[in-house]
């Protein structure tokens, strides 16, 4: 019955609304390896051996028909030893892996799981029990191989080894047999049409999710010393780890933190769950396996999907959607999107309807047709058509198609795009030096200014706007002339939108006037004062005595005169009176000093 059907395969994946894409899919089609149990009989003449010797009582007449039944020597001589005379068909491998805690485990399973399975002893056997045992051994071998790669995987934010793991749902089609193996919550659904006269195709769940709350899984976990804890309505396997502040060997007195960690009871990877007392993994890598005999007249669809699909689309709805899509394609001639892409888009739409952040969603849809396609094996943009009897070969290395769906996370901004504006002026801009206005030492003056050669720098409006973007607050650069003591230049950029370097922004004053301005400076309007300060009258900044006379002896000759000091005192008194007038009615004035008796 082999060769009486063809397969139409479509695959699609979407990141959803998650920050990382951890779903991977894999499709491999390659010639079936030779059987181990019953090797094909090869004629002795083809191997260059003499014919069967004549036994006693066996005449030439009995030997002749036996020799006549052998194939022609020249026809079989071209075949190598141990090979069957008939053409071998191909075996198809399909896998969906949903990673967690990082993409490393899912990527490793996609690249190596099929290789570990097919090299196990008994996989090419004709007995289904031996094939299932070989598949289980392949899962365990892949899991142990991850242990050797653990040191190469990136560590967690706390510096611990990687906690990466993955679910795995595998379908292997060889001849008329379909082998299913899975760990985790990625499921496989089979569409069966019971009555050929009835168009209804019912959905059969081939796999059962490995959840920690299942009695069988909970009993196994607790038997290994683990536990299951409910967190936010979800049952999770508990990770028992020493407290992060602990260093050294783990003893009985070591504080152990119990963290509800993983929502599946079986997975590949998750090496953190190894129990040293029992020598087993609390999160088991051993898969559940099953065997199904395909009947092209009854079995119509095989769907592999991650939990992002099955959490939103029930199995029966998924089968009905695929059936409707195929009817539109073949009966009405509409060449729309593939079944896998349609299912993923429907799932993403339901995530949005429920106002939830969509999970990574992946699907592989296999449509079984009872008629062999005369077009042979070919692929198009969305689908792959296979006839396994023609020994096709296919290997999908990049089947995870990243799409820009409405639920997808926007791409990360490239590092070349600098969000901060940069100055593009060709003129030389002096470095900004921060100093205290009342420090004992003034800024060093450039030689050009010391000689009295002060050049005015003209900036364009474009450069000034760029400078204002980097200087949102008013910035004052004061250059004190410690040699001539004649001028003090202040460069004051403002926050106005149309700012240019004009005479208003370039202020020149004598050292005496600069000192008076520093003394008379008042706080801004939004400055908060305490109760004691408000009761003691207007606020005045106290300046240090002889703050400007400590620099050098050459500066003593240019100190302000007595008349200038009296003028500054008058300005200070005016400021005080002006502040008192703003307080309003004198009857409402508060006392300068208030004593509270409790």
UniProtKB/Swiss-Prot annotation:
Ubiquitously expressed. Residues 49-74, 398-419, 509-584 are annotated as: Disordered. Residues 564-581 have a biased composition (Basic residues). It catalyses: O-phospho-L-seryl-[protein] + H2O = L-seryl-[protein] + phosphate; O-phospho-L-threonyl-[protein] + H2O = L-threonyl-[protein] + phosphate. The keyword Lipid metabolism does not apply. GO terms for cellular component: cytosol; nucleolus; nucleoplasm; nucleus. Binds 2 magnesium or manganese ions per subunit. Interacts with CHEK1 and CHEK2; dephosphorylates them. Interacts with MAPK14. This is Protein phosphatase 1D. It comes from Mus musculus. The lineage of its organism: Eukaryota, Metazoa, Chordata, Craniata, Vertebrata.
């Amino acid at each position: 019955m082999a060769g009486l059907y063809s397969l139409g395969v479509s695959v699609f994946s979407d990141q959803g609304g998650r920050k990382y894409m951890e779903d991977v899919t894999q499709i491999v089609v390659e010639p079936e390896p030779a059987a181990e149990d019953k090797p094909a009989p090869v004629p002795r003449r083809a191997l260059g051996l003499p014919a069967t010797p004549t036994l006693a009582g066996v005449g030439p007449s009995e030997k002749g028909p036996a020799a006549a039944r052998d194939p022609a020597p020249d026809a079989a001589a071209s075949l190598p030893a141990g090979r069957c005379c008939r053409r071998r068909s191909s075996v198809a491998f399909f896998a969906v892996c949903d990673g967690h805690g990082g993409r490393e485990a899912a990527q490793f399973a996609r690249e190596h799981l099929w290789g570990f399975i097919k090299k196990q002893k008994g996989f090419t056997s004709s007995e289904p029990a031996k094939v299932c045992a070989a598949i289980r051994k392949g899962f365990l071998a892949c899991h142990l191989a991850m242990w050797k790669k653990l040191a190469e995987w990136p560590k967690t934010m706390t510096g611990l080894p990687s906690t990466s793991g993955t679910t795995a749902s595998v379908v292997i089609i060889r001849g008329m047999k379909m082998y299913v193996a899975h760990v985790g919550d990625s499921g496989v659904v089979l569409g069966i049409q019971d009555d050929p006269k009835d168009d209804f195709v019912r959905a059969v769940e081939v796999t059962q999710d490995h959840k920690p709350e299942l009695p069988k899984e909970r009993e196994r976990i607790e038997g290994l010393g683990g536990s299951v804890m409910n967190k936010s309505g979800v049952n999770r396997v508990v990770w028992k780890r020493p407290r992060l502040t602990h260093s050294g060997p783990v003893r009985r007195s070591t504080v152990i933190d119990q963290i509800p960690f993983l929502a599946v009871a079986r997975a590949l990877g998750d090496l953190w769950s190894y129990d040293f007392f029992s020598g087993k993994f609390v999160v088991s890598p051993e898969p559940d396996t099953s065997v199904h005999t395909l009947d092209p007249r009854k079995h119509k669809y095989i769907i592999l999907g991650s939990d992002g699909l099955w959490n939103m689309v029930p199995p029966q709805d998924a089968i009905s959607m695929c059936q409707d899509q195929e009817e539109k394609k073949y009966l009405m001639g509409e060449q729309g999107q593939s079944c896998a892409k349609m299912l993923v888009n429907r799932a993403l739409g339901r995530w949005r309807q429920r106002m939830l952040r969509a999970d990574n969603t992946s699907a592989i849809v296999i449509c079984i047709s009872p008629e062999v396609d005369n077009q042979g094996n070919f692929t198009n943009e969305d689908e792959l058509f296979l006839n396994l009897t023609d020994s096709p070969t296919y290997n999908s290395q990049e089947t995870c198609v990243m799409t820009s769906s409405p639920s997808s996370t926007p791409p990360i901004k490239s590092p070349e795009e600098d969000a901060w504006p940069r100055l593009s002026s060709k003129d030389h801009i002096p470095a900004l030096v921060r100093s205290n206005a009342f420090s004992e030492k003034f800024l060093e003056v450039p030689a050009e200014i010391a000689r009295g050669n002060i050049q005015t720098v003209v900036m364009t409006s474009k450069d000034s706007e760029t400078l204002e973007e980097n200087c949102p607050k008013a910035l004052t650069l004061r250059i004190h002339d410690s040699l001539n003591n004649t001028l003090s230049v202040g460069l004051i950029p403002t926050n106005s939108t149309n700012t240019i370097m004009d005479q208003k922004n370039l202020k020149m004053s004598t050292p005496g006037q600069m000192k008076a301005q520093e003394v008379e400076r008042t706080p801004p309007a939004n400055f908060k004062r305490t109760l004691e300060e408000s009761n003691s009258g207007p606020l005045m900044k106290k300046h240090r005595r002889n703050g400007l006379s400590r620099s050098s002896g050459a500066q003593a000759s240019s100190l302000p005169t007595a008349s200038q000091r009296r003028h500054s005192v008058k300005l200070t008194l005016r400021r005080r009176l002006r502040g008192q007038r703003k307080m309003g009615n004198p009857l409402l004035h508060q006392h300068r000093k208030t004593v509270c008796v409790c």
